[in-house]
């Protein structure tokens, strides 16, 4: 029984020594700054990391955020990004409306919603590659 305890204690001591660096200070084996739980930025990889880095710079390369609403007048229309020369748009018209009014917006002049008269304008958009 005693030999089993001594063997376990010796293995634990050897493991502790291996975890220390050459100067005797314990090596942190975590990617987190400060040895705690990693932050979202430290743990994110791939597309998630790319989106987080772009958001930090104030960019939205994959159109994840809601579009910025304008006043909807002819002078200040709602901008509709599109990679083609037309796009279908849905207008709710009123806050408590239960139906969506769908219509096509074509490149060029601003177009109005047939129901409420809100103006929309198609703008060219390039995909992020």
UniProtKB/Swiss-Prot annotation:
This is Cytochrome c oxidase subunit 5B, mitochondrial. It is found in: Mitochondrion inner membrane. One of its GO terms (cellular component) is respiratory chain complex IV. Pathway: Energy metabolism; oxidative phosphorylation. Disulfide bonds: none annotated. It comes from the Eukaryota. One of its GO terms (molecular function) is metal ion binding. It comes from Sus scrofa. Residues 1-31 form a transit peptide. Its main location: mitochondrion. InterPro entries: Cyt_c_oxidase_su5b, Cyt_c_oxidase_su5b_sf. Signal peptide: none annotated. The lineage of its organism: Eukaryota, Metazoa, Chordata, Craniata, Vertebrata. The modification N6-acetyllysine is found at residues 68, 86, 121. Component of the cytochrome c oxidase (complex IV, CIV), a multisubunit enzyme composed of 14 subunits. The complex is composed of a catalytic core of 3 subunits MT-CO1, MT-CO2 and MT-CO3, encoded in the mitochondrial DNA, and 11 supernumerary subunits COX4I, COX5A, COX5B, COX6A, COX6B, COX6C, COX7A, COX7B, COX7C, COX8 and NDUFA4, which are encoded in the nuclear genome. The gene is COX5B. Zn(2+) binds at residues 91, 93, 113, 116. GO terms for biological process: mitochondrial electron transport, cytochrome c to oxygen.
């Amino acid at each position: 029984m005693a030999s089993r305890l001594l063997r376990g204690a010796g293995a634990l001591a050897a493991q502790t020594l291996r975890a220390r660096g050459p100067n005797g200070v314990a090596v942190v084996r975590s990617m987190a700054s400060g040895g705690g739980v990693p932050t979202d930025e430290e743990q994110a990889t791939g597309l998630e990391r790319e989106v987080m880095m772009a958001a930090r710079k104030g960019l939205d390369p994959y159109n994840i955020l809601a579009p910025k609403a304008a006043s909807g007048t002819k002078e200040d229309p709602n901008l509709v990004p599109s990679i083609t020369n037309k796009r279908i748009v849905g207008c709710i018209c009123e806050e408590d409306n239960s139906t969506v009014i769908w219509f096509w917006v074509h490149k060029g002049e601003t177009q109005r919603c047939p129901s409420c008269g809100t103006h929309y304008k198609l703008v060219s958009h390039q995909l992020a590659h």
